[in-house]
C-alpha cells in the first residue's frame, strides 16, 4: 500500500497535459517549459506533483534539441526525487484544474505550411515539427520540408517569393528559409538548394 507510482512529464503541469507537450510549448511560443514529477492517477497527467524543474525555450530551440535538454534534466532530477520519496519526505501538491491545457497529439495535417499564418507562428511551427513530421510546402510540383527558418520584416502577399534569398511572405512579416529538404534528398542549406533550383521573385507558392 505504500508503493508510489510516479511519472516524469515533459511540461510544467497542469500546462500541456497529453501526448505532445514539447511540440505544443514550442508551437505556442512559450518562453519556458520543463518537467514535472507527479503521482500517477487514472486521469491523464493530472496527478499531484512533487517537483518541477524549468528550462527556457529560445527561438533556436526545435523539438529535437529541446527534447534532448529535457531528457538530460529528467535524468538528473529523478534520482534525487526517488531518494525524497524513499525517505518519506515527498510532498505532492494537487494540480490547479482551472489552469490545465492539453497538448494533443501532432496530426499529419498540421505539417502543411499555411502562408496565411504570421511569420513568427510559422517559425515556431517549423521548429516544433522538426525533424518529424516536418513542415512542408510545394514548389514546382515537389514537396519541400523547411528544416530551419527565421522571421524577417519584408512584406508581401502570403506565399509570395519576395527576394532571391528565399524570403516568403506571410500574413504578417515573412520568413527566410535557411535549410530545407526535398523529398527523398538530404537536408541542405538554402545556398546549395538555390544552386540547383531556380526560384522566381513574385511566384506564389502553395
Go through each PLM region and give its residues:
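Donor/substrate-binding cores of folate-linked one-carbon enzymes
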Residues: 1-102, 109
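Alpha-helix N-cap/helix-start motif
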Residues: 15-19, 115, 186
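An anion-binding loop in the catalytic cleft
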Residues: 116-206
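Acyl-group handling in specialized metabolite and lipid biosynthesis
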Residues: 104-117
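A generic structural signal for well-ordered coil/turn residues at beta-strand boundaries
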Residues: 31-34, 45-46, 51, 107-109, ...
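Short secondary-structure boundary/capping segments
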Residues: 27, 41, 103-105, 136, ...
